Swiss-Prot record:
Alphabetized UniProt keyword annotations: Glycosyltransferase, Transferase
Gene3D superfamilies per record: Glycogen Phosphorylase B
Induction: Not induced by pathogen or salicylic acid.
Molecular function via GO: quercetin 3-O-glucosyltransferase activity; quercetin 7-O-glucosyltransferase activity
The EC number(s) this enzyme carries: 2.4.1.-
InterPro entries with a match to the protein in the record: UDP_glucos_trans (IPR002213), UDP_glycos_trans_CS (IPR035595)
Pfam families reported for this sequence: UDPGT
Species assigned in the record: Arabidopsis thaliana
Domain of life of the organism encoding this protein: Eukaryota
EC class: transferase
Leader peptide range in chain numbering: none
Encoding gene per record: UGT73B1
Protein name, entry field: UDP-glycosyltransferase 73B1
Role description: Possesses low quercetin 3-O-glucosyltransferase and 7-O-glucosyltransferase activities in vitro.
Length: 488
């Protein structure tokens, strides 16, 4: 099914939340819409434009002269006037700066997004887009868009499973302790979880009211865009459209839209390691022999835990690539590595301090497993690369994502984390790290399932695939809305 001629006239205004996990797939989405003949404009702040968008957008536009240019619209964000530290334009600032109260500042940062309401109104008047893709953390954007007759699509940055799980979750009254597993009610699959793994907010708290506003704005919106593909979460896609949002389109995996080496290398921030050197190191390794380990941008472990991870990796006997994010003043210190560790594992291990070219690494034939914090972008990149996973969730919806991998897809092994890091956090011993790494690297049935899912992911985004057709359907619906408005 092809897209109608009128689709080329569509103009998408994309407004991502100012965090890696939201900005990166938003850029991928803009590229996707461009390949379908639409124009895309990304709204962001000066710092984020420079860090995340300017270079890859310039490259994309130059490489695709036949497509509508992706453009950037800058919105100023007066941090200090809003009670935030100077330069606090994304969550990376919050999680990488020492001596900050992460919890308080994160909440203040979220609530400060309301500042953009008035500038967005002005832009909708002057730009007259055909659709606003507003991040979930901008609940006020539904009413703003409605005021000007613009359909607002919600983007969460996660998959159907976690969206359904968070909709269904009700903490049971009959469990003895917060660590006792219970089945999530009404959710297909009899999924087990514990109270310690669920992020709950008091209804009358500031965050409780904010989350209610998110749910209400989603209900009143035009629909939801989901970075996933039907074959991955079939039962949960059906459930979501039947009981949660009614209207949703799966358009992923968005990361697979990046086909050129440079696109993959430039995805996100500039890598802290030369990607060619990294791949050269991997080229010297046997197929499926290396475990890749990364915990995302918002996780930072204490030294004691990092020492256990290092020891567990060493004990496993497997070669590894380990991405380590250190916070603030920790960056210069190397007391988190066991004495002589790097010398002992020289040739067997590669430690990347900072940002890694993750998609390039995951796709390399030498990588045989992925130890992940279960952030949705990382998890989906692992699925697209056909990798079995060791799951180490930290917070947010990551425990739900872990259940999808371990209980539904059966392509992962849990390292044994029992509770959220935001609360207290678990301490995982070197023996658990060793055991999980060994198990995931040798399980052939698990690996076979993972490779089958990767093939499904690639087929989903090909012409005529499930996600490709879904994008066409979305375009056609928005085109009809546009044509009806023009008749009035």
């Amino acid at each position: 099914m092809g897209t109608p001629v009128e689709v080329s006239k569509l103009h998408f205004l994309l407004f991502p939340f100012m965090a890696h996990g939201h900005m990166i797939p938003t850029l991928d989405m803009a590229k996707l819409f461009a390949t379908k003949g639409a124009k895309s404009t990304i709204l962001t702040t000066p710092l984020n434009a420079k860090l995340f968008f300017e270079k890859p957008i310039k490259s994309f536009n130059q490489d695709n002269p036949g497509l509508e240019d992706i453009t950037i619209q800058i919105l100023n964000f007066p941090c200090t006037e809003l009670g935030l530290p100077d330069g606090c334009e994304n969550t990376d600032f919050i999680f990488s700066t020492p001596d900050l109260n992460v919890g308080d500042l994160s909440q203040k940062f979220l609530l400060a997004m309301k500042y953009f309401e008035e500038p967005l109104e002005e832009l909708l008047v002057t730009m007259r887009p055909d659709c606003l893709v507003g991040n979930m953390f901008f609940p006020w954007s539904t009413k703003v868009a409605e005021k000007f007759g613009v359909p607002r699509l919600v983007f969460h940055g996660t998959g159907y499973f976690s969206l359904c799980a968070s909709h269904c979750i009700r903490l049971p009254k009959n469990v003895a302790t917060s660590s006792e597993p219970f089945v999530i009610p009404d959710l297909p699959g009899d999924i087990l979880i514990t109270e310690e793994q669920v992020m709950e907010t008091e209804e009358e708290s500031v965050m409780g009211r904010f989350m209610k506003a998110i749910r209400d704005s989603e209900r009143d919106s035009f629909g939801v865009l989901v970075n996933s593909f039907y074959e991955l979460e079939q039962a949960y896609s059906d459930y979501f459209k039947s009981f949660v949002a009614k209207r949703a389109w799966h358009i992923g995996p968005l990361s697979l839209g990046n086909r050129k080496f440079e696109e993959k290398a430039e995805r996100g921030k500039k890598a802290s390691i030369d990607e060619h050197e990294c791949l050269k190191w991997l080229d010297s390794k046997k197929c499926d022999s290396v475990i890749y380990m990364a915990f995302g941008t918002m996780s930072s472990f204490k030294n004691e835990q990092l020492i256990e991870i290092a020891a567990g990796l060493d004990m496993s006997g497997h070669d590894f690539v380990w991405v380590v994010n250190r916070k603030g003043s920790q960056v210069e210190k190397e007391d988190w590595l066991p004495e002589g560790f790097e010398e002992k594992t020289k040739g067997k291990g590669l430690i990347i301090r900072g940002w890694a070219p993750q998609v390039l690494i995951l796709e390399h034939k030498a990588i045989g497993g992925f130890l992940t914090h279960c952030g949705w972008n990382s998890l989906l990149e692992g699925v697209a690369a056909g990798l079995p996973m060791v799951t180490w969730p930290v917070g947010a919806e990551q425990f739900y994502n872990e259940k999808l991998v371990t209980q539904v897809l059966k392509t992962g092994v849990s390292v044994g984390v029992k509770k959220m890091m935001q609360v207290v956090g678990d301490f995982i011993s070197r023996e658990k790290v060793e055991g999980a790494v060994r198990e995931v690297m040798v399980g052939e049935e698990r690996r076979k399932r993972a490779k089958e899912l990767a093939e499904m992911a690639k087929n989903a985004v090909k012409e005529g695939g499930s996600s490709d057709l879904e994008v066409d359907r979305l375009m056609e619906e928005l085109t009809l809305v546009k044509l009806q408005k023009e008749k009035v």
